From Swiss-Prot:
The active site is at H75, D121. Residues 22-27 form a propeptide. GO terms for biological process: arachidonate secretion; fatty acid biosynthetic process; lipid catabolic process; phospholipid metabolic process; positive regulation of fibroblast proliferation. It is found in: Secreted. It comes from Ophiophagus hannah (King cobra). This is Acidic phospholipase A2 2. Ca(2+) binds at Y55, G57, G59, D76.
Length: 146
């Protein structure tokens, strides 16, 4: 086999091994990602919001660093409220919604939990779209800034 082909094949195999270690995202996060992309076309939500400020990403504490971080805090609080509903798990609940020209609508066929979670995500996506994105708030030291 040609050494160049062998090198390319090896690189592909290593890439695939790395990709297989990435855990799948819960369906709801895929839906929330879609909502954000509806309100902010061209955004890459997993990249842009997974480690922003004190509240965007997993966990959250302290004082939000800016308006966008406050959107994430409100979203976290909304999920806490959703968990008060009977058998409602906002991190895994699937819901139905439409996106039309940047406008999000939660569908009427959602059950109570799905409607609540859908609205949490809809409000957050709209909030993200209206908030400035400050690159200096990416990957901050949460022990000193939050």
């Amino acid at each position: 086999m040609n050494p160049a082909h062998l090198l390319v094949l090896s690189a592909v195999c290593v890439s695939l091994l790395g990709a297989s270690s990435i855990p799948p995202q819960p369906l709801h996060l895929v839906q929330f990602n879609g909502m954000i992309r509806c309100t902010i076309p061209g955004s890459i939500p997993w990249w842009d919001y997974s480690d922003y400020g004190c509240y965007c990403g997993s966990g959250g504490s302290g004082t939000p660093v800016d308006e966008l971080d406050r959107c994430c805090q409100v979203h976290d609080n909304c999920y806490t409220q959703a968990q008060q509903l009977t058998e409602c798990s906002p991190y895994s609940k699937r819901y139905s919604y439409d996106c039309s020209e940047g406008t999000l609508t939660c569908k009427a066929d959602n059950d109570e939990c799905a409607a609540f979670v859908c609205d949490c995500d809809r409000v957050a996506a709209i909030c993200f779209a209206g908030a400035p994105y400050n690159k200096e708030n990416i990957n901050i030291d949460t022990t000193t800034r939050c």
